[in-house]
Regions:
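Short, well-structured N-terminal submotif of metal-dependent ribonuclease cores
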Residues: 1-37, 51-66, 70, 108, ...
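Phosphate/NTP-binding elements of NTP-utilizing enzymes
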Residues: 45
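Short secondary-structure transition/capping segments
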Residues: 49, 69, 88-90, 124-127
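Active-site neighborhoods of divalent-metal-dependent phosphate/nucleic-acid chemistry enzymes
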Residues: 55-61, 69-117
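Short acidic-hydrophobic, aromatic-tinged amphipathic segments that line or gate anion-handling sites
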Residues: 76-77, 127-130
């Protein structure tokens, strides 16, 4: 299975593993699965740190550089096709970052791993619920 972690799942997988369900933990650890991250999640972590909603040590840039090297992840490149697909998967979702993640899952044929109720109700892409 090809899994795209949403931003919260990515951060929790590194910092708060107890927030992951047994099924999600198992899927992320399964070597048969590919685990992907979007540059949108990297950007979103930076924004959360700038707003003071997330604190990473020693700082956001160093933490993310280390996190991206420590855990082998595939990068879901942001493309024009992904941007255009945001209007198909969750056109009324209020969070643009979430719309990009849903569109990325659709375009790349990935399963979006999320706890977000709005994303779990999305159309045109598969999800793995963190419940």
């Amino acid at each position: 299975m090809k899994l795209l972690m949403d931003t919260h799942i990515w951060v929790w997988s590194l910092l708060e593993t107890d927030r992951l369900s047994h099924g999600v933990s198992k899927a992320l650890a399964d070597p048969a699965n590919e685990v992907w991250v979007s540059p949108i999640s990297v950007w979103e972590v930076l924004v959360l740190c700038q707003k003071g909603r997330l604190v990473l040590q020693p700082d956001a840039m160093a933490w993310m550089s280390g996190a991206l090297l420590r855990v082998p992840l595939k990068e879901a490149t942001l493309t024009h096709e992904v941007a255009l697909a945001t209007g198909q998967v969750a056109p009324h979702h209020p969070d643009p970052a979430d719309r990009f993640l849903a569109a990325t899952a659709k375009v790349y044929g990935l399963t979006l791993v999320t706890s977000n109720c709005n994303l779990l109700a999305g159309k045109g892409f598969s999800v793995l619920a963190n419940r």
